[in-house]
Design a protein with these regions (language model features):
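Surface-exposed interaction regions that form or flank ligand-binding interfaces
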Residues: 1-85, 96, 125-241
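Short, basic/glycine-rich phosphate-binding loops at helix/coil junctions
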Residues: 36-38, 115-122
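Catalytic metal-binding acidic patch
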Residues: 86-92
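Active-site beta-strand-loop-beta-strand hairpin of nuclease catalytic cores
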Residues: 92-117
């Protein structure tokens, strides 16, 4: 009987601890920039790996990036040829624009900055995926053109972030000036780059750039559909290699 009591007390303690942890996570989410900008419910973000990865990365940046900054999530940037390309996170900083491609993977990632496809390795399984540096170069190019049309010609930094489920990140970055890191080191890497940059935007200009990009976060359904189909096509191509 005493054993059963001990088991029940242990189970109750674990459940209580889990409830308190979840409540604390929900409170933190409600106060986050990600929630304020996207309006998404915690449960939806928690159940979606992509959204959860973007949220975890943005939390790190929100807490530790120095200087004035704004965040824009999931902007659909128009392409010259028609259609659009979707950015994960754009950080508008007084010293420039940081275009962040977020990957919520686990296991190992291997590749080279100048190779078109990289490897994602899990126990007993390997798959290829499109080089996120190349992917983000497209985002930067279209974003540069969009802001240029509004008279803004700003320094832009490409940042590739893998969430901390990736235990080994083996990528040779020779020839690339992009930032590549896991999410727990994203803020320190970006702060290091910021120390080499000069201020280019005042508060009013930052707000204007924010408004330009924020207007791109609520596309018509067919814009989202076209972007999803292009992503699926690219992934199918990677799977054949």
């Amino acid at each position: 009987m005493e054993t059963w009591k001990a088991v029940l007390l242990l189970a109750a303690g674990l459940l209580c601890g889990a409830w308190r942890w979840r409540s604390r996570e929900k409170r933190r989410y409600r106060r986050s920039v990600y929630r304020a900008e996207t309006g998404k419910q915690y449960k939806k973000v928690e159940e979606n790996r992509g959204m959860d990865g973007e949220y975890r990365t943005s939390l790190e940046l929100e807490k530790r990036i120095r200087g004035r900054r704004y965040f824009v999530f999931n902007a659909y940037i128009p392409c010259r040829s028609g259609g659009s390309t979707e950015t994960d996170i754009v950080m508008i900083h007084e010293k420039g624009i940081f275009v962040i491609e977020n990957k919520n993977y686990c296991g190992q990632v291997r590749g080279r900055a100048n190779r078109e496809y990289w490897e994602h390795i899990l126990p007993g399984k390997r798959r290829t995926f499109y080089n996120p540096i190349y992917q983000n170069q497209g985002h930067v190019r279209h974003l540069r053109r969009l802001l240029g049309e509004h008279g803004y010609h700003l320094p832009m930094v490409s940042v590739i972030v893998f969430n901390d489920g990736v235990k080994r990140l083996r990528v040779k970055m020779a020839g690339s000036d992009a930032i590549l890191c896991r999410s727990r080191r994203a803020a320190s890497k970006i702060n290091r780059r910021l120390r080499r940059m000069e201020q280019v935007l005042d508060e009013a200009e930052m707000e204007e750039v924010y408004g330009i990009l924020k207007a791109q976060t609520r596309p018509f359904w067919w814009v989202r559909y076209g972007q999803r189909k292009r992503a699926e096509k690219l992934q199918k191509k990677a799977g054949k290699i």
